[in-house]
């Protein structure tokens, strides 16, 4: 038997089993990387996403080569042609691949006509394997993230004081998520100058015109494990102490606040979840950092991220087509060009995404996702857009975050109520409304904020469905304060808004 290893573009780690199991034999084992331009044509990806993935692949391939692995790097239109050639040239009889996290890619590999056995090895890049998550989920009546997170804290003994949570509580969000104060002094994100490999990828993407979405330069992301570790160290040193307090705040021109910016690297395999959690927990003990920030951050990586991955595998393929509210509006043109909206919150957030391929969680959930939800945009259209636009997007993390959390299209598998809000929330958590063409307090009239008329129209339209959720009753009781006449005006503003939209 001759073994060959195919390294996938989102598993750039020597810890994956195909590499760690064969370490002692590395000089004899052929390893292949494939950049397929056909695959990336499926989505109009942000150009910085393409640069990140291909540059990180090229760097990782060079590192393996320097470590004496027998590396082949192919740039091709598809996957099958270079694979077949390489398998034949090296007489490979068993192709080892880390099981792809994304279902569509797993299906694609299984459909390839290859003249050898394919051995999928377990993906060890999460704290909970998908089988462990499914066992946990099958043992529960309800799938609450908070229950899962507590189970993880106990299982991996993180922030524990014996059998009790450190400080006596599991969750310190009461001290987190404050509105932004004026003149906050935020840390600048750590940036990296493109090296020769990255510059070559940038030039090639410009030349080949794989996508025209998003600014390609300046490109400041890390592209190697070593650089990603610097991002983690910088976060722990400079941002972690304040992370929790302003986790949900949004400020004009402040793209990253105290957020970690580690998701692109975690999702590519350049960082491991356990090393992040350990670095943060160690800093807590060594520097006596505020527990609200430390616990709040660990909950993101150990709770939310693992939970989203688990739910993706717990659900079947049909999850991606969920549409509980039966929303079918198309994607407005301004999602592809921020200059085409005069709603300041959307304009600021979409401009930022165009410039960096990044937005923090509340910008994604409460500005972009919230707008799509209350305006009635198709969950699949908005999911496609998120998948194209964000630097850290992959199918497993998109389905759960966009279809489930953002759009509530799964009818409550993942969240107990929809994340829907009016301008009131955006005004409280940001400074966007102060500079907007619209009036944040109006839900009718010439300057009515679209977040307001869409919000009330959403509640009114889906009143019966929302009633069944129980947790929406208080919100729904406010509908009584609005007269039928006013609802007529609200719904005509919503209809008029759609009539005036250019569709992308
Ligand atoms: P921080 O705020 O510093 O958080 C730390 C880490 O926690 C993140 O890096 C991430 O690894 C993890 N995390 C926190 N929440 C989640 C979550 N809900 N799901 C998965 N991981 C989480 N995350 C992605 O990795 N890729 C995506 O494409 C993506 N799309 C999203 C779309 C929507 C509509 C929403 C609501 C959330 C999405 N998220 C996605 C989750 C979250 O917003 C990002 O992980 C986070 O903003 C990344 O920035 P950061 O590294 O600075 O995160
Ligand atoms: Fe957004 Fe409305 Fe505030 Fe303008 S007024 S920034 S549209 S929420």
Residue ranges and their predicted role:
Residues 1-74:
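N-terminal beta-strand-loop-alpha-helix module at the start
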Residues 8-12, 249, 253-263, 268-504:
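C-terminal catalytic domain of photolyase/cryptochrome flavoproteins
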Residues 39, 154-265, 444-451, 463-504:
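A eukaryotic "domain-start" boundary segment
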Residues 6-10, 34-35, 74-77, 97-100, ...:
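Short His-Asn-centered micro-motif
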Residues 79-221, 403:
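Beta-rich, aromatic/charged-enriched effector core domains that present basic-aromatic interfaces
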Residues 14, 19, 28, 32-37, ...:
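Alpha-helical membrane-anchoring segments
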Residues 15-17, 41-43, 244, 274-276, ...:
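Short helix/loop capping segments that flank catalytic or ligand/cofactor-binding pockets
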Residues 68-76, 378-384:
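Glycine-rich phosphate/pyrophosphate-binding loops
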